[in-house]
Amino acid sequence: MARGGRGFQGTVLKALRVPEHKLTVTGVREIPPYTELTVQCPSLLGARAAALPPTTWVRMWIPENGREYQRAYTLTRINRAQASAIILFLHHEPAGPASRWSSRVRPGATVAVQVMGGTSYRPPSPGDRMLLVGDPASAPALADAVDAAPAGSPVTVIMLAPETGHLPRAERDHQLIRLDPEVSEDKLLAAVDHALWADTGDLALDWVWIALESGVTKTVRRHLVASGMNRRSTQHQAYWIRGRAMGIASDA
């Protein structure tokens, strides 16, 4: 068990009486560049638990060397009957506490999680023409969003990801456009424009979700709004910040 408090964020969550849940790891699978954990938690994932919208992420308190590090990870493939879900940990260099923990964890291990502000996702309306733009960090959430899309909505996904390595994919039908992660900004925006405009010159999209590195996310969103997309139809969520860890450490 980690020693010490959980810092300011932990104090706020405690003051707001945000419930704490315990996830139990029941399965571990290596699918580079991810580690896939199957977890169970009746209080959060069971049949009587509150509904969780698509792309919901949990605040995980990752233990390491007597401290706890808060990191956010998306719950996917929720199975209410089994009170289970899948969490994918993307490995990168330099490795962080969550990446190291997922590499050494074994079935039977537990980890504390809380849910507060677990998603800003606004679901599309039936028939909306959808575009999602992401990368390996947000791919689990994008797959979850695509699987939850209305049956009559055509879906296009632009993914900045290498051709090699596992990439989480939705089971629902969708068009996937895979771009080199080092692609230039101009080429990324050109791919977005190709999805944005119909042959008639009219907008071909009703709903967009952008989930990339913080700076790139802002660039794509500004481009879409400048091109005529309604701001409320253009959602965005940065899944990482270049050169910075997304999370906090507990008090030592």
PLM regions with names:
Residues 1-252:
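Extended, composition-driven regions rather than compact fold-specific motifs
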